[in-house]
Amino acid sequence: MLPLSTPLLAQLQRVTEHFHQLTLNVEPVAAHEQAILSLSDFVVENLQAHPEWLVEIRQHPPEAQEWHQYTEWLQQLLASVEDENTLMRVLRQFRNKILVRIAWSQALHSITTQETLQQLSMLAETLIIAARDWLYQRCCQDWGTPCNERGEPQPLLIIGMGKLGGGELNFSSDIDLIFVYPENGITQGGRREMDNTQFFTRLGQHLIKVLDQQTVDGFVYRVDMRLRPFGDSGPLVFSFVALEDYYQEQGRDWERYAMVKARIMGSDNQAYGEELRRMLRPFIFRRYIDFSVIQSLRNMKGMIEREVRHRGLKDNIKLGAGGIREIEFIAQVFQLIRGGRELCLQSQALLPTLQIIAKLTLLQSLQVKQLADGYLFLRRLENLLQSINDQQTQTLPEDELNRSRLTWGMGFESWDALIIELNNKMSAVRAIFTQLIGDDSDNSDEEPSHVPFKSLWLEDLEKEELIILAPHLDEEIAQQILHIISVFRHDVGKRTIGPRGRDVLDHLMPRLLAKVCLRQDANNQDVNNRNVNIVLERVIPLLLSIVSRTTYLELILESEAVLAHVIRLCAASPMIATQLACHPLLLDELLDPQFLYEPLPLNAYKDELRQYLLRIPEDDEEQQLEALRQFKQAQLLRIAAEDITGVLPVMKVSDHLTYLAEAIIEAVVLQAWGQMAKRYGVPSHLSQRQGLGFAVIGYGKLGGWELGYGSDLDLVFLLDCPMDVMTDGDRSIDARQFYLRLAQRIMHLFSARTSSGVLYDVDVRLRPSGESGMLVSTIGAFADYQRNQAWTWEHQALVRARMVFGDENLHRDFERIRHQTLCTRREPALLRQQVREMREKMHKHLGSHHSDQFDIKADPGGITDIEFIAQYLVLRYAAENERLVRWSDNVRIFQLMAAYEIMDEDEAAGLTQAYVSMRDELHHLTLQTHSSRVSIHCFSEQQERVRRSWQQWLGE
């Protein structure tokens, strides 16, 4: 055994003093006891709280196979448990006691790393199943036993995902679970009938609480349910049929990847378990050899590498190059490609899978040995690191004490020696990973055209010398370029940039200058300002923002694609240039041109966001806020790139911006709901209805599927909850108070300013009674307000309103209220007068009031006039034809007016053309960071057409 280093001896002294204060004869006497207690604060704290555990360890030292007794030991403790609070205490204390024994064995090398992983996994499984079974019996006593149509009792099956499923759990870990039951039906033998979905949902909620909730005894495991179908927005539990339907119809590649390690917890219910495995197998393992998964895994790896950069992670042995995740990817690429034919590859555990890969000669024996050795080395290091404080971390420490702990625990003389071996192991893994899965980046060699531009960056060239390099530049442009470079060089000199960063910048700048100066439009002074000096002025702020962050400089240097896209997009839009400068993490989005310029399916935004958020711990609110903002910025960049290149027409641009906003709204509501439910429980009436009893109504451009790049969100919050309902948590509050706080929380999540800015500006002034009204209205109060108190302009706003989040019951109620309100018969002359007065008021406040300018949005003949015409027509004629209220967007409203012969087809087409062309121009003005004001001569034909329609329908 290695001697203890100075930091460990100092730590041991502090620990020994604490043990003396216990007045029990449990001082660490033996050398191995002293070593162990100097390694882990978690072990020390638990033995101080339970000194009898140390006595027990001395009498019955931990053994490799003692996990076989976990169930028996725990059942003895649970025999006298009669309430949920006692259950939680017993589970937590048992968990901590066994973890102390595992940490003890691990430090002494008395069990192998594989045996450690097995013990950690079996401990988790034992605790999960024991908690489930205790709660199942209690729920059956309260609500009856869930049965299928044949009267057969139905169990709750729990699928363990990730390392839990593979039997490779780490010391301090989340557990990823999916809850499943075989068949639908109702409970039998209870005080009242309850359908199986409701029973198992309640059981699942109790189980999560019992395992996850922090108490004075700590927690059992942090439970993550986001890998289930539909993630947080989906049901908590699924029947076999519902699960099968989801994976057959909607299962994604990343879900196949996750399912490789899926394992059903517990040894009971074997028949149902085998049925479930048989059902999932075709989704996970394809019958044919499936090479498409390589690209999918490459994409997932790219997402992880971006996360490492975004979160500033370094020295991360899980996510870094050559880390644990890459070893898992290597094994799973063979499982997903060949597992359908080679049944022996259908294993959840990694190390046995590697041996099968070697046996099938899919990798060389030496490579498999390097992967296995690297995996065991990294997993031991990870467990030692996490056992210090029972913290889920894979980042190497920077302080001397914890480095000394890892050095001793890994059997090295010094930290430097440990790091050398770690780097060797990870480099070997990285080489195999790159060979197998590859890298998507374009690493082409330096082109000869770059070489002459080194002097432009490194030396003070004269104007004439630059013109020799780029003969097509005129003198004025050349002089401006030299000035821009000189100022940038001076600014760089004031920044903290190390030798490595300086070297990367000196290699990057000649490439960038060559590409910019040799552009064919170098002297163009067109409307897009794409001449060289303008492009450089837009790119330079980005370079200044990353000049001390070498990782991003290297990203641009090593990828021709990224450099080309930076120049192209900055040339096209100052808005994009500003976004890249403010948020350099967006550079990652430029790596894959196919991704950048290929529109995402409209219905895919929610799933993309769900995948994006899965990598962030649910309880890390700060990172969740950042992730939402980063996702939005990345998707905005993608949409803008597709807009600029003509891939997306104007109608589709707004569609994508709207669907993106809806995906984010759903994520924000669910995130806020989770935070509130954790604090207060959920409103008790939800046990009698589906959904959350909460809806978000989108007004304005969101309601009309017409969002622009800088649009805010006009939202109204509705609830469906009876009076006198309370939440069911330990800190129970009135349910309507719960919904009010939920809405306030949602507003906070949108408006909180992080390093990535605010998520959206949200305007809630369109709610009943405006700023003086309640932030959340009951559905009944909303109906009453629309019927008895709302102004005409509020009914105009309702034309463009639709539900963007909520359950079916609320959706049906809202549509009924909207339908009844808009179909109310009105006096035509009074309606015309009220609409006209509101329009005049808006023009007075928002119009340009300049004879030589035309405000596309606010001036007569512009977009607002078109919107008011559409709203007037709906309010005027819906009483006669209720089908006119079907749509909330202007284009389809005009289609309806023409279809039902209220408006002439040519007039409807003319208004639609004017509306679409003006919106298109607004999008592009936003990309150029220009206002909505243009020359009075722009859109003159459209202005005249709109004015004629206005006069016809709303003129005096």
UniProtKB/Swiss-Prot annotation:
EC number: 2.7.7.89, 2.7.7.42
Catalytic activity field: [glutamine synthetase]-O(4)-(5'-adenylyl)-L-tyrosine + phosphate = [glutamine synthetase]-L-tyrosine + ADP; [glutamine synthetase]-L-tyrosine + ATP = [glutamine synthetase]-O(4)-(5'-adenylyl)-L-tyrosine + diphosphate
A single GO molecular function term of this UniProt record: [glutamate-ammonia-ligase] adenylyltransferase activity
Cofactor: Mg(2+)
Domain of life according to the entry: Bacteria
Region described as Adenylyl transferase: 450-956
Single biological process term from Gene Ontology: regulation of glutamine family amino acid metabolic process
Location of the region described as Adenylyl removase in the Swiss-Prot/TrEMBL record: 1-441
Keyword Transmembrane appears in the UniProt entry: no
InterPro entries in the record: GlnE (IPR023057), GlnE_rpt_dom (IPR005190), NT_sf (IPR043519), PII_UdlTrfase/GS_AdlTrfase (IPR013546)
GO CC aspect terms: cytosol
This protein's UniProt keywords: ATP-binding, Magnesium, Multifunctional enzyme, Nucleotide-binding, Nucleotidyltransferase, Transferase
Enzyme class at the top of the EC tree: transferase
Function field: Involved in the regulation of glutamine synthetase GlnA, a key enzyme in the process to assimilate ammonia. When cellular nitrogen levels are high, the C-terminal adenylyl transferase (AT) inactivates GlnA by covalent transfer of an adenylyl group from ATP to specific tyrosine residue of GlnA, thus reducing its activity. Conversely, when nitrogen levels are low, the N-terminal adenylyl removase (AR) activates GlnA by removing the adenylyl group by phosphorolysis, increasing its activity.
Family stated for the protein in its record: Belongs to the GlnE family.
NCBIfam families in UniProt: PRK11072.1
Name of the protein in question: Bifunctional glutamine synthetase adenylyltransferase/adenylyl-removing enzyme
The organism of origin for this protein: Photorhabdus laumondii subsp. laumondii (strain DSM 15139 / CIP 105565 / TT01)
